[in-house]
A protein has these predicted regions:
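A short, ordered amphipathic alpha-helix with a cationic face
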Residues: 12, 16, 133-134
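Non-catalytic terminal extensions of PLP-dependent enzymes
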Residues: 35-196
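Conserved core segment of the aminotransferase class I/II
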Residues: 1-14, 22-34, 39, 118-127
């Protein structure tokens, strides 16, 4: 009788056994493989950061925003400004998690796109989604947020980097052929997005 009462307390009068079975399977998979899935997710985001930070053409138009860019120093006791520095390599994220009041989610990459002359929403909609089929969930005035997940593959990261390089090459060609007035207009748009 006690078991029946406890069981009825935690169940429904119309349970959906397919959903319950799916939740049980998902819980078991996370228990067995969750750490590896999340580790690969973070590695995908870190490789994205490294690829953008070390590619000379991408540096010209894009910047991965770091803890130092987004979190005031008084909230970063560890003193770590970036998870990845091209000169020094990787920093110990665990130190940030242990000491800092605020940290960035290592699985998300905030990319400043104002250097392209496009605002975040235009870059998301007209460039990434319409032209290349890349889905972005969050934007700001001059940034887009890439969110990796446990399904993010190396090939999807490579495709994104390839697309960013192609966009940068097209901008280079456009600016090479631009008149002085067109270049000034581009520079004003960039300044408006990045400095004002």
């Amino acid at each position: 009788q006690a078991f029946r009462e406890a069981y009825m307390t935690h169940t429904s009068t119309s349970p959906n056994y397919q959903i319950i079975a799916s939740l049980d399977v998902g819980r078991r998979q996370v228990e067995l493989e969750g750490f590896e899935f999340v580790q690969r997710q973070v590695e995908a985001a870190m490789s994205m950061r490294r690829a953008i930070a070390t590619h000379p053409l991408l540096q010209k138009y894009f910047k991965v925003l770091t803890s130092g860019d987004m979190i005031p120093e008084e909230h970063r006791e560890s003193g770590i400004k970036s998870y990845y520095n091209p000169d020094q390599g990787w920093n110990d994220i665990w130190e940030c998690w242990a000491k800092d009041e605020f940290v960035l989610d290592a699985s998300r990459v905030t990319l400043a796109v104002g250097g392209t002359g496009w605002d975040g929403d235009t870059f998301k909609t007209k460039i990434l989604m319409d032209k290349y089929g890349i889905q972005i969930n969050k934007t700001s005035r001059n940034t887009v947020l890439f969110m990796t997940n446990i399904g993010t593959t190396r090939s999807s990261v490579a495709y994104l980097i390839e697309v960013l390089v192609q966009i940068a090459q097209e901008l280079d060609e456009l600016l090479d052929d631009a008149s002085k007035m067109e270049r000034l207009s581009f520079e004003r748009r960039v300044k408006n997005l990045m400095e004002d």
